[in-house]
Amino acid sequence: MVGRDENELQDVQLLGSQGTTYDFNYTPEVLEVFDNKHVSRDYFVKFNCPEFTTLCPKTNQPDFGTIYISYIPDIKMVESKSLKLYLFSFRNHGDFHEDCINIIMNDLIDLMNPRYIEVRGKFTPRGGISIDPYCNYGRPGTKFEQMADQRLIQHDMYPEKIDNR
């Protein structure tokens, strides 16, 4: 079957909504899922989110970065508009870059229980230092657990040239 019927989309409420509300405070409840129609296949889904902002927990100064989310879905998949609104909800959330990346990954694991997921942040420099945190997860007891270990070990073997974000 090609396409999706209304029954398959009943839990997707934000997509197509003309009255979108932007919450400036951390709101994981906004995340929505839909069913993966290809559960018999392993494949990656990647989101590139270049407009992520949050606040420094100490100074309240804004931090800017790009978030990369890659995952291998199982039964559920995250809906992209809800993900956009969720990431937007970090705007007034005060946390360190490393914490934000882990919070995002943990919320997505709780939401959709993927086979594998990795979240990477590329934050613009503050004080002359840029921070690029990376975290990942592979479902325990599966090949994805070993995959997570290998990708973590190799995630930055060939670091990029940092000249301008």
Swiss-Prot record:
First-level EC class: oxidoreductase
Catalytic center residues: 56 (thioimide intermediate), 63 (proton donor)
Known EC number: 1.7.1.13
Molecular function GO labels: preQ1 synthase activity
Pfam families: QueF (PF14489)
Organism domain of life: Bacteria
InterPro entries: GTP-CH-I_C/QueF, NADPH_dep_7-cyano-7-deazaG_red, QueF, QueF_type1
Gene Ontology cellular-component terms listed: cytoplasm
Pathway: tRNA modification; tRNA-queuosine biosynthesis
GO biological process: queuosine biosynthetic process; tRNA modification
Keywords tagged on the record: Cytoplasm, NADP, Oxidoreductase, Queuosine biosynthesis
Record's subcellular location: Cytoplasm
Reactions it catalyzes: 7-aminomethyl-7-carbaguanine + 2 NADP(+) = 7-cyano-7-deazaguanine + 2 NADPH + 3 H(+)
Residues that bind substrate: 78-80, 97-98
Function: Catalyzes the NADPH-dependent reduction of 7-cyano-7-deazaguanine (preQ0) to 7-aminomethyl-7-deazaguanine (preQ1).
Family under the similarity heading: Belongs to the GTP cyclohydrolase I family. QueF type 1 subfamily.
UniProt-recorded name of the protein: NADPH-dependent 7-cyano-7-deazaguanine reductase
Lineage: Bacteria, Bacillati, Bacillota, Bacilli, Bacillales
Gene: queF
